[in-house]
Amino acid sequence: MDILISKDRAIAPPSAIRFTECRLPGCYLLEFPSYRDYRGRFVKSFQRSAFEQRGLECDFKETFYTESAENVLRGMHFQVPPADHAKLAYCISGGICDMALDLRVGSPTYGEHESYELSAEYNNAVYLPRGLAHGFLVRSAPSVVVYQVTSEHSPAHDTGIRWNSFGATWQLSAPVVSVRDEVLIPFEQFESPFRFDPELVSKPMPAKEPAR
C-alpha cells in the first residue's frame, strides 16, 4: 500500500519491510514500504539487515528481470546443487500468480505447492530458500518480474519441473509456454537432490562483530 505524500511535505525515511511466513518452510511474503507523491513513487525493495535478522540467505550474486505478455507461464525453474540458490522475486509492472513447489526431501511440505499474488500495485515480493521450484502466470500485462538470486546462472545446473505435473491450479487451460518448459521432467519422475534442513530455515545468523 502506498503512503501518499503532499507537495509541501518531505518524504520520510522508509519504514521496515514486512515479512509474513508462508506455509512452505523458509518461504516469506514481503511487503515493501512505498511512498507516492505528485512526482511518482518511491519503493524500498531490499534491506540486508532485515533478512539477516531472520537468518535468510541474501548474498545475491545476480539480478535480472523478465517482461511477459498476458497469459504467459514461466516455470517451474531451479538450479540443482552446487549451483542452487535462494531467490527474491517481485513485480515492478503488472501482476502475476507466483508459484513455489517444495522439492526438499524430508520437508513437511515436500511435493506441495503454494501460490502468491504479486503485483506492482501491492508492492510485495516472495522469498524462496534453496530447494524450491519457481514459476508464475501473468495476470496483468505487461508484467516485469525482477529476480535476485544467490548464485550465478549455470546452464549445466539449470533445470525445472513441468508446470502441469504437480497438481497446481493455474486457472487457465492453455497458457503461453515455451518449448523448453513444455518438455521439462514431470514431478513424479524427478529424483530430488535437495534435502530439508530445519536449522537452515529457522536459525538466525550470528551478529557481526563491530569494526575495529
What are these regions, as identified by a protein language model?
Residues E121-N123, R130-V149:
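Ligand-binding loop in jelly-roll beta-barrel domains
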Residues D2-E121, S140-P142, E152-R212:
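Non-catalytic, conserved peripheral segments adjacent to functional cores
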